């Protein structure tokens, strides 16, 4: 199976599917259609019924081969790649039996070094796919696409493996936070689903951040600096003051585990106007709300000293902790745990310090935990994929389908 995984992943990563946060269309880039159309053809060649809408949401159905009712399970992956780094002319390199030493990435002068990326020590002896140092790899999330495709093909090639109805979904624009925005849960028509969009072997994630984006706009008063005393209000200084009043230790670079943070993503402006772009993250809903409240309080504390109330704060909730929707449905986690155990994989249920499409889908009525793909260092030239772990992920897809069928009961 490793050969087929390498061939399929190579085929997919060479297609540039980078999304664009500045676009107003869905998909945000036309080039995502290139992979979506290919996947539709490949699914149809496997005998699956497909359905792709005008927004690039490709759904397919593998019909049940049993004569009793079990839940319909879905498997999801996104086709777009991150806008954070070059995604064109991807030239994947294969490292056989990785020896644990630094890997020179093509002619780029970049080195994939286990001293810098210690998770590489977990894949010694594996076959790896890496970049040539000039682009990201796109294993996030084309590895997930491969694992679903290979899992479906395996089930078709082994009709003795019993399974219920399986729904497949390949979606656009996850990397820019819009993956579920046009996702039609009723059209997908699954009882629950799994995103194949994790990283290290064993990841089984059903806790995510609560997330919001915050725009702080500071309005100044521009006066000639030679006569500015008691008249000028410098918007840049207001922005600096605002940021200084947030807890300095509650930032991404000083937090881990369940610790939340404020993250200043961008700060631009001049004397007349300055804009600060933040994201807020916290696993705890109460603390999440307190973080938003704290930013409003800082605004008020500064504005009280000025006649024109110079600071505005706009908050937009992005997604919420999917544990709220998944934990009451214990079987959705128990199923992959049993599959992991059968494959000698130790489950790692640590919370995601981020979000997946499943974070939003779970609140849209489709509970969707996240499962490992075997890849790491996403969104940059040091991205890699372990073909060995990807093979295990394929067997997880197969195992979940089999486990649902073998349970002989409906979890609806």
From Swiss-Prot:
UniProt keywords, alphabetically: Aminopeptidase, Cytoplasm, Hydrolase, Metal-binding, Metalloprotease, Protease, Zinc
By its UniProt entry, which InterPro entries does this protein fall under?
ArgE/DapE_CS, Bact_exopeptidase_dim_dom, Peptidase_M20, Peptidase_M20_dimer, Peptidase_M20B
Q: What reaction gets catalysed by this protein?
A: Release of the N-terminal residue from a tripeptide
Q: How is the cofactor bound?
A: Binds 2 Zn(2+) ions per subunit.
Is Transmembrane helix found in the keyword set?
Answer: no
The protein's enzyme class? hydrolase
Quote the record's binding site residues for Zn(2+) 2: 140, 175, 379
UniProt record, GO biological process: peptide catabolic process; proteolysis
Subcellular locations according to the entry: Cytoplasm
Documented EC number(s): 3.4.11.4
Q: Which GO molecular function terms does the record list?
A: metallopeptidase activity; tripeptide aminopeptidase activity; zinc ion binding
Query: Which family does the entry's similarity section mention?
Result: Belongs to the peptidase M20B family.
Name of this protein: Peptidase T
By which gene is this protein encoded?
A: pepT
